[in-house]
Amino acid sequence: MIFHKEEKKAVERLKNMAKELVVYFSVYGTAKIVAEEIAKQTGADIEEIEAAVPYDSNRDHYNALARLAKKEHDEDQRPAIKNEIDVDSYDTIYIGYPMWWYTFPMIIYTFFDKYDFSGKTIIPFNTHMGSGDGGTYDTIRKLEPKAKVLTGLPVEMRDAENGPAKAVEKWLKSLR
């Protein structure tokens, strides 16, 4: 393939761009909404963390999900992840999740256990019903001491459902 001078420059710029990935876990879809908005505004690739045993996404069964989440937390379980996610090809990884029992779901621990984030930039975001980030951003810093963890974005569940575009835009500008 033959490239002209300007095309060569464009290809070189693309090669030098930091590759970004948005990874998220979402049962009710609110973290997914925020993840999709981040991917849209950054041009990042996007991947869902899929549980090997799917969680019940029927909101009428919230209490059952809450009990299961508490049991997983109390027993320090690591739920299996169904899909493989290529984090090695990315420099910057946005990681999103809902808050369960004032922390992230145990499957997020599985995700951090499974992959090496050394030398990468991690940018967390989460959805919640009033607990903010619950200290999870500091937990990520402890779990991944060889990664650079930037300021995260906590989004209230109703704000995610009503459209997080402005909050995401403001947050992304603060990171740059």
How would you name each of these model-derived features?
Residues I2-I95, Y102-F104, Y109, D113, ...:
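N-terminal beta1-alpha1-beta2 submodule of the flavodoxin-like/Rossmannoid cofactor-binding fold
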Residues G130-L143:
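Glycine-rich, charge-decorated loop segments at or immediately adjacent to ligand/cofactor-binding or catalytic sites
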Residues Y90-T92, G119-K120, A147-K148:
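Loop/turn elements at helix/coil->beta-strand transitions in domains of secreted/extracellular proteins
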